[in-house]
A protein has these predicted regions:
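Alpha-helical transmembrane segments and their immediate juxtamembrane cytosolic regions
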Residues: 1-289
Length: 289
């Protein structure tokens, strides 16, 4: 995502990025606020409420659209941070990344020590607030792509190790809390995949390191095509997810260990096919990006 292209100003960047993501985003906000009435998933009162709040937040049945807001925020901030990223040395970026990594430990630290580093009910902007959040991922990715001098073998094995540690940590954080018969709130039990937690950073960085070992002059055609369709797939996949979950879990009553991969694969394929069909329609960029 960053830094901006040489010679591109802030307004050109905004126009290019937001013209791609905002129209489809708004269209799917309307669709998630209305279409579920057809199969009885929401009533008219909920639909009206969701439509009236489109400018404030995502609809009731479109929880996955939460990520659009951090993405929009990143796009807004990239022109501001780009001059620093373009000129920052490896050491300067490492300093930022270290503080970012410490900030990703704070959800766990809060469990043990309570409020820390200026946190209180009248101040959420703790000491590391400006080094926290998804901007850290952007700087980390730039550092790996530009400054990291590891060999291909070191990236492969190091990335694999980080992936394994991050994945095991995430899995363990759930299983050590999910006690049968004990009711826990969702934010408590889902701390392990709160995205800006250290284990998710390890898993993400490891994956990026492994991908960086792929040496090819250009991506295969099917990868490029899928990449172009990925935004539309993301926007619509919850429609398909509900359908396949109902089929595999309720109608066929498959065990969870079988149902989850079946739901995932079918949702992915359905979203891919539907997005591809829509892409053939003139003006489809306003719907799927």
């Amino acid at each position: 995502l960053g830094p901006m292209k040489e010679g591109q100003n802030m307004w050109q960047f905004y126009r290019h990025r937001f013209m791609r993501i905002l129209p489809p985003f708004l269209i799917f906000m309307v669709l998630y606020s209305t279409l579920p009435m057809l199969w009885g998933q929401i009533d008219s009162a909920t639909s009206v409420k969701d439509l009236s709040r489109i400018w404030l937040n995502f609809p009731t049945l479109a929880g996955h659209l939460w990520f659009m807001y951090p993405l929009i925020s990143l796009y807004l901030f990239i022109p501001i941070v780009s001059p620093w990223i373009s000129k920052a040395s490896a050491k300067e970026e490492r300093f930022f990344i270290v503080l970012f990594l410490v900030s990703t430990c704070m959800p766990y630290l809060n469990r043990v020590a309570g409020e820390v580093w200026g946190q209180c009910f009248w101040n959420e902007y703790h000491m590391l607030w400006y080094f926290s959040g998804y901007l850290g991922y952007l700087v980390l990715a730039h550092y790996i792509r530009v400054h990291l001098t590891w060999s291909r073998s070191k990236r492969l094995w190091g990335g694999g190790l980080l992936m394994v540690i991050g994945a095991l940590w995430t899995i363990y954080s759930f299983y050590c809390q999910a006690v049968p018969g004990e009711i826990l709130s969702t934010p408590v039990i889902e701390i392990g995949w709160a995205f800006c937690t250290i284990n998710c950073v390890l898993l993400t960085a490891g994956t990026f390191l492994i991908f960086s070992t792929i040496k090819a002059p250009s991506a295969p055609r099917w990868v490029t095509e899928m990449s172009k369709l990925s935004y539309g797939m993301y926007l619509m996949h919850i429609f398909w997810l509900g359908l396949w979950a109902a089929l595999f879990k309720h109608n066929l009553a498959l065990p969870t260990v079988m149902a989850i991969p079946c739901i995932a694969v079918c949702t992915f394929i359905s979203s891919l096919i539907a997005t591809k069909i829509i892409s053939l329609i003139p003006g489809s960029k306003w719907v799927i990006g």
